[in-house]
Swiss-Prot record:
GO terms for biological process: amino acid biosynthetic process; aromatic amino acid family biosynthetic process; chorismate biosynthetic process; shikimate metabolic process. HAMAP family: Shikimate_DH_AroE (MF_00222). GO terms for molecular function: NADP binding; shikimate 3-dehydrogenase (NADP+) activity. Involved in the biosynthesis of the chorismate, which leads to the biosynthesis of aromatic amino acids. Catalyzes the reversible NADPH linked reduction of 3-dehydroshikimate (DHSA) to yield shikimate (SA). It holds the Pfam family Shikimate_dh_N. This is Shikimate dehydrogenase (NADP(+)). It catalyses: shikimate + NADP(+) = 3-dehydroshikimate + NADPH + H(+). Gene3D superfamilies: Leucine Dehydrogenase, chain A, domain 1, NAD(P)-binding Rossmann-like Domain. Its EC number is 1.1.1.25. CDD domains: NAD_bind_Shikimate_DH (cd01065). It comes from Rhizobium meliloti (strain 1021). NCBIfam families: aroE, PRK00258.1-4.
Length: 286
């Protein structure tokens, strides 16, 4: 197998455990068809025990893959096993995008870029803020914190049920990040221009606790990285309280762009056609 920029017909993957639920093949399949590219992108389920060998197979050319995406639970292992992880993935300790270059596996993390690109598209001017509130301190919150910090947000409040987890993120990302327990939520939302839910609250339509957003800045944006359902209970609450909302689907779509460009040589565009393809698939599986 040749490296991605040398191969006429390239094949890419998404791997996780499980991975059959992934909508990434729909996204990349749409772009391959749109560009008329001879290539493929397919789901390839790998257990945690088998993942190191899978990475070796890619590097040694024992698969037809030029690279691919990595999802739960392999992101941290992908970072550790890659030959050349970049600075973004190094700070996060996790990678979601891999590609072969000169016989080495390179790695990056595009989750944060996907997050801010979604806001850029659907809430223009969102970054003219001084403070943001992040609900949750899991792996997903790391990429969000990194991305909004790098866009210039000076104060980032991380609120979590377990304050120790939030403090770990404050230690990781420096003085811009402040850790809080859930009890501090009413205080830290005061004047904030962005509220981000990175937890599973409201996923699959489950009830979410009531949150009073009234302390947010008048033009604040409330967003959720969950996209099933598209309008989560948390987003409904924020909308009813008069705030701009952004669903999480765009993050999924935009984070896919850099990988496609690496593997297939063309930069795709996230548009309404692609968004509707994914929404239709979500409706079919509701």
């Amino acid at each position: 197998m040749h490296d991605s920029r040398e191969t006429f017909v390239n094949h890419a993957f998404v791997t996780g455990y499980p991975v059959k639920h992934s909508r990434s093949p729909l996204i990349h399949g749409h772009w391959l068809k749109q560009f008329g590219i001879r290539g493929s992108y397919r789901a390839h389920e790998v257990t945690p025990e088998a993942f190191p060998d899978f990475m070796r197979q890619i590097k040694e050319g024992r698969t037809d893959f030029c690279g691919g995406n990595v999802t739960i639970p392999h992101k941290e292992a992908a970072f550790r096993l890659a030959d050349r992880p970049d600075e973004l993935s190094a700070e996060l300790g996790a990678a979601n995008t891999l590609w072969l270059e000169n016989g080495k596996i390179r790695a990056t993390n595009t989750d944060g870029r996907g997050f801010v690109a979604n806001l850029d598209e659907r809430a223009k001017g969102w970054d003219r803020i001084s403070a943001a509130v992040i609900l949750g301190a899991g792996g997903a919150s790391r990429a969000v914190i990194q991305a909004i910090r790098d866009r210039g947000v000076k104060t980032i409040h991380v609120v979590n049920r377990t304050p120790e987890r939030a403090r770990e993120l404050a230690d990781r990302f420096g003085t811009a990040v402040h850790a809080h327990s859930m009890a501090a939520l009413p205080e830290v939302v005061s004047g904030a221009g962005l509220f981000v839910n990175t937890t599973s609250l409201g996923m699959d339509g489950e009830p979410a606790p009531a949150i009073d957003f009234s302390g947010l800045a008048p033009d604040a944006v409330v967003t959720d990285i969950v996209y099933v359902p598209l309008k989560t209970p948390l987003l409904r609450q924020a909308e009813e309280q008069g705030f701009r909302i952004v669903d999480g689907l765009g993050m999924l779509l935009h984070q896919a762009v850099p990988g496609f460009e690496k593997w297939f040589g063309l930069r795709p565009v996230v548009d309404e056609t692609l968004r509707q393809i994914i929404i239709s698939d979500m409706d079919r599986h509701a």
